[in-house]
UniProtKB/Swiss-Prot annotation:
One of its GO terms (molecular function) is glutaminase activity. The keyword Secreted does not apply. Keywords: Amino-acid biosynthesis, Cytoplasm, Glutamine amidotransferase, Histidine biosynthesis, Hydrolase, Lyase. The active site is at C84 (nucleophile), H178, E180. It holds the Pfam family GATase. One of its GO terms (biological process) is L-histidine biosynthetic process. IGPS catalyzes the conversion of PRFAR and glutamine to IGP, AICAR and glutamate. The HisH subunit catalyzes the hydrolysis of glutamine to glutamate and ammonia as part of the synthesis of IGP and AICAR. The resulting ammonia molecule is channeled to the active site of HisF. This is Imidazole glycerol phosphate synthase subunit HisH. It comes from Thermotoga maritima (strain ATCC 43589 / DSM 3109 / JCM 10099 / NBRC 100826 / MSB8). CDD domains: GATase1_IGP_Synthase (cd01748). The gene is hisH.
Length: 201
């Protein structure tokens, strides 16, 4: 199994690399690579990490010719997983960067959290509909996704606002929190992602 982690800017890339590496220890024949430019062959599982500004994140993907590379994985029904800003980039657009198109892999947009206490930072509970472990995960973000209920995989409440903290459309997954910073439960979640990718379900 080949796992790729897009590496084109800030985004806790090495933390995610180490987290995925630890999560893969119970699986055989797993290789993990950092991806800075398109490859001729596709990965079984591709991560899009990221922190910071929506517009900047899309600019880096565009300048490194990675937008079509990501879309090819979706077209070939490979698993694509967005983490933090990477999850937001899966959507069509964001209030943070008016006029900038996202990857548009999931219908919906990204808006600012209503709370005056921003960013939403620290441990908070994620309630999943299925597949992944409920519990407390680590968040650092100011914006949140808005999408159809059918794409909401997990929810979180912050300062009275309930928002999608995990989304799914087929084999496209998004996690607003940082599994790589979420201790044992984050490792369990990453193990489950690898398991799903291996079984192609």
């Amino acid at each position: 199994m080949r796992i790729g982690i897009i590496s084109v800017g800030p985004g806790n890339i090495m933390n995610l690399y180490r987290g995925v590496k630890r999560a893969s220890e119970n699986f055989e024949d797993v290789s993990i690579e950092l991806v800075e430019s398109p490859r001729n062959d596709l990965y079984d599982l591709l991560f899009i990490p990221g922190v910071g500004h929506f517009g900047e994140g899309m600019r880096r993907l565009r300048e490194n010719d990675l937008i079509d590379f990501v879309r090819k994985h979706v077209e070939d029904e490979r698993y694509v997983v967005g983490v933090c800003l990477g999850m937001q980039l899966l959507f069509e657009e964001s209030e943070e960067a008016p006029g900038v198109k996202g990857l548009s892999l999931i219908e919906g947009n990204v808006v600012k959290l209503r709370s005056r206490r921003l960013p939403h930072m620290g441990w908070n509970e994620v309630i999943f509909k299925d597949t992944f472990p409920n519990g407390y995960y680590y968040f650092v973000h100011t914006y949140r996704a808005v999408c159809e209920e059918e794409h909401v995989l997990g929810t979180t409440e912050y300062d009275g606002e309930i928002f999608p903290s995990a989304v799914r459309k087929g084999r496209i997954l998004g996690f607003q929190f940082h599994p790589e910073k979420s201790s044992k439960i984050g490792r369990k979640l990453l193990e489950k992602v690898i398991e799903c990718s291996l079984s192609r379900r």
